[in-house]
């Protein structure tokens, strides 16, 4: 083969190679454009603002956690109590019944009350049932509303979950007297305006009262709940209130007297379902 023909042949090969390479680039570019068009643009990730704690409030938070049992209080998962519950209407006892309560935090409970033919209330997140001798039914909306609000701001969930949620503001509050007990307040404000006040015993740092103001989803009016805790006893290293009184809009609506309490008991599978 002559040198001239060889050069021509090599030039042809290079042209073919460049053409194939350019075609590959075009194909890759087309695929990238198709993928870009098929996939919607991703929104930039935003970091949640952590809770904001006033430096003067931090010692109060540390004190109440320590008083309640420190790590033992922070780590337990279930609580089983037995005792008596009073329903109160117009400051008159409307009902009295023995009860058994099983709670798996943060939002599951099985609450049975009554003697011969007990009624059982089961809550599992947004699901809520009532079981009695006639069978199974759904809890009334007002029951569900009160349960969800009261468990969200219970002493356990407030101090283990709520105060750590994004954008929560925690500040020291004023001093007060609750049931003749001198208290120091902590003001907790959630995004959206819900305000919670935690009153601590000034000597022991144990919670005496939790007050929370929540907008009723049905009436759109603001309801003020107040839970008063007393008669603390050491149970498995955790200071446990054995007497609880609940107020709604300044009216006493229930009282609970616990005879016994146990932590971290195991419950059967499906215990927080109506078939459990």
Set out the residue ranges of the language-model regions.
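N-terminal mature ectodomain segment of secretory-pathway/periplasmic proteins
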Residues: 45, 51-53, 58-137, 169-174
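Bacterial N-terminal signal peptides
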Residues: 15-27
């Amino acid at each position: 083969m002559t040198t001239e023909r060889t050069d021509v042949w090599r030039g042809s090969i290079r042209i073919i190679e460049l053409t194939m390479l350019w075609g590959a680039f075009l194909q890759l570019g087309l695929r990238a454009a198709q993928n870009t068009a098929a996939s919607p643009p991703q929104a930039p990730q935003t970091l949640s603002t952590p809770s904001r704690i006033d430096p003067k409030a931090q010692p109060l938070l540390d004190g109440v956690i320590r008083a309640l049992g420190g790590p033992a209080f922070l780590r337990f998962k279930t609580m089983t109590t037995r005792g008596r519950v009073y329903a109160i209407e117009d400051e008159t006892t409307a009902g009295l019944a023995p009860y058994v309560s099983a709670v798996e935090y943060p939002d599951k409970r099985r609450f049975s009350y009554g003697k011969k033919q007990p009624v059982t209330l089961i809550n599992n997140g947004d699901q809520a049932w009532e079981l009695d001798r006639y069978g199974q039914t759904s809890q009334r909306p007002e029951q569900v509303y009160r349960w969800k609000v009261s468990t969200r701001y219970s002493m356990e969930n407030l101090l283990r979950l709520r105060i750590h949620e994004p954008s929560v503001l925690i500040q020291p509050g004023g001093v007060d007297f609750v049931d003749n007990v001198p208290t120091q307040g902590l003001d907790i404000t959630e995004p959206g305006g819900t305000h919670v006040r935690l009153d601590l015993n000034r000597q022991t740092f144990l919670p005496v009262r939790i007050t929370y103001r929540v907008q009723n989803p049905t009436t759109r009016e603001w309801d003020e709940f107040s839970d008063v805790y007393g008669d603390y006893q050491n149970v498995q290293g955790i200071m446990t209130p054995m007497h609880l009184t609940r107020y709604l809009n300044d009216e006493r609506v229930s009282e609970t007297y616990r005879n016994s309490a146990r932590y971290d008991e195991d419950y059967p599978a499906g215990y927080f379902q109506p078939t459990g």
